[in-house]
Amino acid sequence: LLVMASGNNGTDCDKKIYYPQGLDKTGKRIDNLIRIGASDINGNPGSISNYGKNSVDIFAPGMDITSLGENNGYTTSSGTSIAAPVVAGIAAIIRDYFPKLSAGQVKEILIKSVTPMNYKRVKIPGLNKKGNVATYDSLCVSGGIVNALNTVKMAQQLSSKKNK
């Protein structure tokens, strides 16, 4: 599974194309590429995160994340390049514990097992001086934020069905 940061322009990727788009030559979604947006500690999309109802698959924590820095120190960073490794790590756990699942199945599980945020009206990322709001299902395919526990549970269910 290829995990890709969607970008940090606060742009609707359904309207402005960023490559790779995650589509094959015929326009069909590629099942082994997942595009990630960044969310903050309150579950809101990051103000810089790209988004798109059809072009960003899932949001993950990616704003004000503290990690290791230079000289045995720490650093705080934000963006979809911070959120993408969160999803990659969860995908790696799934592939390790459930190696018979395909990349496409792992992507589907990640998308279907989110913490749904469709009910929450959030500020649309970008230079949003008008205060425009939307629900998560208009900002990404999954309509929510990655949930590691739900992902493991769903993978376990799917894997046990395949083994019967």
PLM features per residue range, with description:
Residues 3-7, 36:
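Active-site neighborhood of phospho(di)ester-bond hydrolases with catalytic His/Asp-centered motifs
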Residues 9-14:
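Active-site environment of divalent metal-dependent phosphoester hydrolases
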Residues 31-35, 98-164:
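C-terminal subdomain of the subtilisin-like protease fold in secreted/lumenal serine endopeptidases
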